[in-house]
Amino acid sequence: MFNDIGALELLTLGVLAVLVFGPDKLPKLIQDVTRTIRKIREFSDSAKEDIRSELGPQFKDFEFEDLNPKTFVRKQLMDGNDDLGLKEIRESFDLRKEISDVTDAVNGRTPAASDTANSAVNGSAGAAADGVTTSLTKTGETTPDLLKKAPQQAQPERPPFDADAT
C-alpha cells in the first residue's frame, strides 16, 4: 500500500504531523493510531478464522487473496494445466508468420514464393521434390521502379469558404 512512498515524502509527512498536532500531542496520537491498526488487524484475522471454521475441512486450503479478481484470473490462466486450450489460441496468433507475410507483400513477393525461397535457402528438399524452382534474381519488368515519381492527380476544386459558418 505504501510501497511508493520515498524518504522525502515520509520526512514531509513527519514535519506536517509535528506542525499540525504539535510535539506534545504527537506521541499520544501515534499510540492511538497504532492501537487502532492492531485492533483492525485482529478483527480481520478473527473474521477470516471464523469463516474458515464455518466452511469446514474441505476449504482448509482456501485463500482470501484468491477472491481478488485479478489474482483469481492470473492463477487460473497462468497455472500449468491448460484445460481451456489457451496454448492453441496463443500459437494461432503467431506474429512472426504474420509479419513475414506483410514484409513479403511489401516487397512484392507472394507468400508461396517466399516460402519456397526460404525452404531452398534452409536446405530443405521439399521445393526441389515438387519441381518448382524460384529465381532469386531481379527482373526489370516485374519489380516496380520506386524511385520514379508517381503522376500527380488533378486535385478537385475546393468548396467556397464560408466565414459565417465557422
Swiss-Prot record:
UniProt lists compositionally biased (Polar residues) regions at 132-142
Per the annotation, which location comes first and is thus the protein's main one?
A: membrane
Which residue pairs form cystines in this protein? none
The alphabetized UniProt keywords are: Cell membrane, Membrane, Protein transport, Translocation, Transmembrane, Transmembrane helix, Transport
Listed NCBIfam families = PRK01371.1-1, PRK01371.1-4
Membrane topology summary: Single-pass membrane protein
Name of the protein this chain belongs to: Sec-independent protein translocase protein TatB
One Pfam family, short name: TatA_B_E
Protein source organism: Streptomyces griseus subsp. griseus (strain JCM 4626 / CBS 651.72 / NBRC 13350 / KCC S-0626 / ISP 5235)
The annotated subunit structure for this chain is: The Tat system comprises two distinct complexes: a TatABC complex, containing multiple copies of TatA, TatB and TatC subunits, and a separate TatA complex, containing only TatA subunits. Substrates initially bind to the TatABC complex, which probably triggers association of the separate TatA complex to form the active translocon.
Q: Name one GO cellular component term.
A: TAT protein transport complex
